[in-house]
C-alpha cells in the first residue's frame, strides 16, 4: 500500500467511526436521565426519609449521575419537590366529576381517592398544603371540583369555599394519625391523672380502623351540612 493509499484508508476509518450509523450502534450503559426518573427517585426518597432527605447531591448519587446534570431538568430543589407533589396529585381519581354522579356522591368518592393518595405519601403533604401554584395536576384537581360544584348550581363563591373546605379536611386527616398518637403502654395513662383514658393504650393497634372510621364520620357530617346549605340555596333561587 502506497503512502497516499494509507492516508486515504485511515481517513475513511476516521469518517466511518464518526458517522451517524456507527454512533447509533453505541448504547449508554445506564438509561438516559429524564424528568420522570428524577421525580420518581425523589418521591421514593421523600416517602422513605422525608423532605430533608432530598438534595441535588443525594439525588445525583441515587441516579448514578453528576449533580450538574440535574439542572438540565430542574433549577432548584424546590422545583423537584413541587414536581413530586404534582405527581401525587396526579394519582387522585377525578372520573366521578365526569360520569354523572351527583355532587354529594362525587365529593365523597373524590375525598376517598384524595385521602388514599396522601395516605400513601404523607411526607409530601406539607408541600401540597401550599396550594396548587402552577402545578398542572393540582390545578386540574381544583378545576374539576370547582367546575362540578358550579355545574350543580352552587353559587361560584360557595363552590370556591367547598373546594377549600374539602382540601382542609382531607389534608388535615393525612397529616397524622389520631390513634397512632397514643403509646401501647398502659402505665402511661395513670387513672389518677387521666381517668377517662384507661383503654388508650389499645388505640395504636387499631390505628388504621379507627382513623378510617373517623374520616368517614367526619366526611359524612361535612356532606350532611353541605346538603342542608344546598337546599337553602335551591329554595332561595
What are these regions (language model features)?
Residues 141-191, 204, 208, 226-229:
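Hydrophobic alpha-helical bundle segments that form small-molecule/ligand-binding pockets
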Residues 1-58, 62, 75-82, 213:
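Basic, helix-initiating cap at the start of DNA-binding domains
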Residues 36-44, 48-49, 79-95, 105-113, ...:
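Alpha-helical structural segments
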Residues 64-74:
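Short hydrophobic/aromatic patch on the recognition helix
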Residues 94-137, 156, 166:
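Hydrophobic alpha-helical connector segments
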Residues 2-23, 179-237:
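C-terminal peripheral helix-coil segments that are non-catalytic and often amphipathic
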Amino acid at each position: 500500500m502506497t503512502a497516499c493509499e494509507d492516508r486515504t484508508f485511515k481517513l475513511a476509518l476516521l469518517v466511518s467511526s464518526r458517522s451517524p450509523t456507527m454512533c447509533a450502534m453505541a448504547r449508554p450503559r445506564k438509561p438516559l436521565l429524564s424528568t420522570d426518573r428524577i421525580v420518581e427517585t425523589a418521591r421514593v426518597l421523600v416517602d422513605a426519609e422525608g423532605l430533608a432527605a432530598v438534595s441535588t447531591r443525594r439525588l445525583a448519587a441515587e441516579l448514578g449521575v453528576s449533580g450538574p446534570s440535574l439542572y438540565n431538568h430542574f433549577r432548584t430543589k424546590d422545583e423537584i419537590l413541587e414536581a413530586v407533589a404534582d405527581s401525587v396529585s396526579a394519582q387522585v381519581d377525578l372520573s366521578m366529576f365526569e360520569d354523572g354522579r351527583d355532587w354529594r356522591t362525587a365529593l365523597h368518592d373524590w375525598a376517598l381517592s384524595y385521602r388514599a393518595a396522601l395516605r400513601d405519601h404523607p411526607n409530601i403533604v406539607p408541600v401540597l398544603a401550599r396550594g396548587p401554584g402552577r402545578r398542572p395536576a393540582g390545578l386540574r384537581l381544583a378545576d374539576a371540583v370547582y367546575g362540578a360544584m358550579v355545574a350543580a348550581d352552587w353559587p361560584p363563591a360557595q363552590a370556591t369555599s367547598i373546594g377549600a373546605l374539602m382540601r382542609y379536611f382531607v389534608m388535615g386527616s393525612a397529616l397524622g394519625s389520631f390513634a397512632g398518637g397514643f403509646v401501647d403502654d398502659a402505665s402511661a395513662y395513670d387513672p389518677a391523672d387521666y381517668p377517662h383514658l384507661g383503654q388508650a393504650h389499645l388505640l395504636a393497634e387499631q390505628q388504621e380502623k379507627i382513623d378510617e372510621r373517623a374520616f368517614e364520620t367526619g366526611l359524612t357530617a361535612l356532606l350532611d351540612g353541605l346538603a342542608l346549605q344546598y337546599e337553602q340555596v335551591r329554595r332561595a333561587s
